[in-house]
Structures are given as C-alpha cells and as structure tokens.
Amino acid sequence: MADRPRTLAEKVWEEHVVARGEGEGASREPDLIYIDLHLVHEVTSPQAFDGLRAAGRPVRRPDLTIATEDHNVPTVDIDKPIADPISRTQVETLRRNCAEFGIRLHPMGDLEQGIVHVVGPQLGLTQPGMTVVCGDSHTSTHGAFGALAMGIGTSEVEHVLATQTLSLRPFKTMAINIDGQLPPGVTSKDVILAVIAQIGTGGGQGYVLEYRGEAVRAMSMEARMTMCNMSIEAGARAGMIAPDEVTYEFLKGRPHAPKGADWDAAVAAWDALRTDEGAVFDAEVHIDASSLSPFVTWGTNPGQGAPLSATVPDPADFADETAREAAAKALRYMDLTPGTPLREVAVDTVFVGSCTNGRIEDLRAAAEILKGRRVAEGVRMLVVPGSMRVRAQAEKEGLGEIFTAAGAEWRQAGCSMCLGMNPDQLEPGQRCASTSNRNFEGRQGKGGRTHLVSPLVAAATAVRGTLSSPADLD
C-alpha cells in the first residue's frame, strides 16, 4: 500500500492498523486501529467506567489517557460546590473513576484545567501523526496538528479504555482547497462557516476533510484548530491539516512534546506527514479565500449562514423543497424576517469562548476591538477562556482588564455558554452572537437563539448591539 501516492489521512491510518479487516471495497470488514491519545471528560465517561468495573477490567493504558472537567463546571465561584445536583454528580464521579483507575485528572482550579480540546494541545499531548479520540464530537480539533482525531460514543470510550484500540472502517477523503489570501478582518471561523454553507451540514458525511492551500498555510495553529474543530458541523468524521513549521513552533517546549534529540527525530518523521503528489482524494472543494468576508449564521444549523453584508434569506428563494421548509422553520424559531439586513439584527448576549474560539489568540482579537470601548447598553457579554492557562496568559497580557473595563464578564475556564449543561445559559427568546460551534434550537438554553460568529464579529457586535464587523466601528 505504501508504494502508491497516499493522502495524509491514509498515511496516519495505515500506521495504526493493528489488524486489517477482511474483504475489499464496501464489503470490507473494519480495521482494528491503535489509539495514541484518549481524552476524557465528565459527561460521556461514567457508563464506560461502570462497564470496566462490571467486567473487572483495568484501563489498559492510563498513561495515554487524560481527563479534565469542562462541560458541567461553573465559570464563576469555582471554589464553591457545584449547585446543580446532576452536574455535581458527574464531576464527582469522574474524580472517583480517575482515582480508582489511575488516570491523570485536571480538576477545577488546576492550572491545566479547561476544555479538553484546549488542554490537549496546550500541554503538547496532541502531536502530528497521532490517533486521538474523545467522547466528544469536536475531537476533530486535534486534526490541526496532522493527527487523525475523532469523536466517539460511550461504548467506544469503554472499548478504548479497555483495549487502547477501536474497530473502524476506513474513511473517504475530501480535499478542501482554500487558495489565495484572506482579506483583512476575515478569520478561519469565517472560512469554516463559508465551507459548511457551501457543502452543507451533510456534505462531509463519511469523509476526513484535509484543509489545504495558501490561506491554510498562512494560518496560526489556533486558527487551524478552529477550522478542524467545525469539520463535524459539515458532517465529516474528522478534519486534518498537514504539519509544518507553524505546527512545530507551537509544539516546541510544551510539557509533553519531545525534547532534545527526540525532538529532532520527531520533526524528521513529521515532515513526511503530508499528502503525496499524485494522491487522489475521493472529493475536492475549491474556495477562493480572497472572495470571503465576515460570516454569520441566520438559522438553526451551522450550514444556514451568509456573509454579514447579506440580508436574511427568503425561504422561497431556495430551489430545494426540503431546504425551503428547513429555512422557514429556522426563521420562525429565530424570529427573523426575510430581507432584513443581518447588520440590523439586535442581540441580547455575546459569548466569546468554547473549544472553537476560546484560545489566547481569540481573546486577543476580541480585546483589540473592545479596548477603549464599551459593551452596548442592554447587552451582556461573557468572555470565557478555554483553559485556566489561557486565562493566566490573558491576565498577564492585561486582557482581563480590557474585558472588565468594557463591561464584559471575565470568567473562569469551561465550556460555558456553548451548551446548556451548566449555569451559563440563555433565557427563552434571548439572542446571542456566539463564537461557539452549534446554533441548534435550544443549544445555549431553552428557547435561546444563536448566531455563530468569529471573535472579531462577536466583539464588534457587543459594542454596537447588532451583528457587526470591526469595520462597522470605524
């Protein structure tokens, strides 16, 4: 297999096959794949540990397993007991399970605590060529390092804990070619929202997406993680970017990154992790980066988006009946009128954070817009770092002072308002400009309405009170 040109995804896959499934094509049996890194949190792991306990099995590789508390944790008063009994039980259960099975845990208050997809990269645990899994759909984030990273279900969590392997069928591959240079004020969040709008929320189903092209190479690691994070919103199994000097610069010196001669050997191996010339993808998409502008969702799935300069679409303009019905239903829930300029849509809340946009670069971008300005009257803004280490760095740079001076709430680390599983939620009817990844009905709280945006758009929106880009503040 190695004598033919291969894609990045194929290379990583084939390096991890423990046992190849019998057969060919659609009838091929699953391969048994070795897992290099298993990330765990409090929501999808309790039943998995119960299964191990019932079967009398240990965790096979606790040294390749790391846990953190993120989904259910509060982002204020973290020194007090968690108020919600279900959330408190899940967090306490994770602590007991990690202690019993010998798994390293970063609890609330720990400097390395935070959202699992922020913590893994910041510790240098995520490295090129790895297979990475977690009981969380946005595990695809780690693909920004050239890793094959996938979200898995609770039964699969148990299987990996017990065997350090997964039974999987090979995925198809899709190249997302983003050529040219991004205009000023356009970010990777705008790019991925545009990709999803183009191919749809099911366009990537069954595929691993590989992001390629000049615009991708020019992105920071934080920006690349944002794009790979939302591959799932396009229906994909994973997203990947070949490692390069940007990757190595990010990783070098991190706690779990190789050191000395091991680092040199690792980089030499990582340099081979790129799609070979002549390799054939199952599908390809081309996007002109120079044509993109700040993007925003108007509906109730991430594919229902448009440039901020557009108006709310008319369902009648959709050619497909299913799309027309979906758009009409979304607009009813979002309480939007066709033809309304998106820049005139007022918000109650702005959220900057999540595993999509809760890293230090995202906070710097938001702070740059907020510096010397105030959050609009009647708007509540939450800024939630993706990890306690990100928060510490932001404090060191004075970003926390900028947020609070502007009237925003500067909080502790956690998933926060990305999802309605902790105290940070919208009230029914409230509208939020959010840097998170999903805008489903009730995602941020029952009856809440979500517009997905970049940190730049979020900060500008907080200042003006309506969906806005930084250019609108000039």
UniProtKB/Swiss-Prot annotation:
Name the pathway it acts in. Amino-acid biosynthesis; L-leucine biosynthesis; L-leucine from 3-methyl-2-oxobutanoate: step 2/4
Question: Which UniProt keywords are listed?
Answer: 4Fe-4S, Amino-acid biosynthesis, Branched-chain amino acid biosynthesis, Iron, Iron-sulfur, Leucine biosynthesis, Lyase, Metal-binding
- What CDD domains would the database entry show? IPMI
Cofactor annotation comment: Binds 1 [4Fe-4S] cluster per subunit.
GO terms in the biological process aspect are:
L-leucine biosynthetic process
Quote one Gene Ontology molecular function term: 3-isopropylmalate dehydratase activity
Cite the InterPro entries for this sequence. Answer: 3-IsopropMal_deHydase_lsu, Acnase/IPM_dHydase_lsu_aba_1/3, Acoase/IPM_deHydtase_lsu_aba, Aconitase_4Fe-4S_BS, Aconitase_4Fe-4S_dom, IPM_dehydratase_rel_enz, IPMI_cat
Q: Which domain of life is it from?
A: Bacteria
Cited PANTHER family: 3-ISOPROPYLMALATE DEHYDRATASE, HOMOACONITASE, MITOCHONDRIAL-RELATED
Q: How does it assemble?
A: Heterodimer of LeuC and LeuD.
Function, as annotated: Catalyzes the isomerization between 2-isopropylmalate and 3-isopropylmalate, via the formation of 2-isopropylmaleate.
Q: Which protein are we looking at? A: 3-isopropylmalate dehydratase large subunit
Give the species: Nocardia farcinica (strain IFM 10152)
Encoded by which gene? Answer: leuC
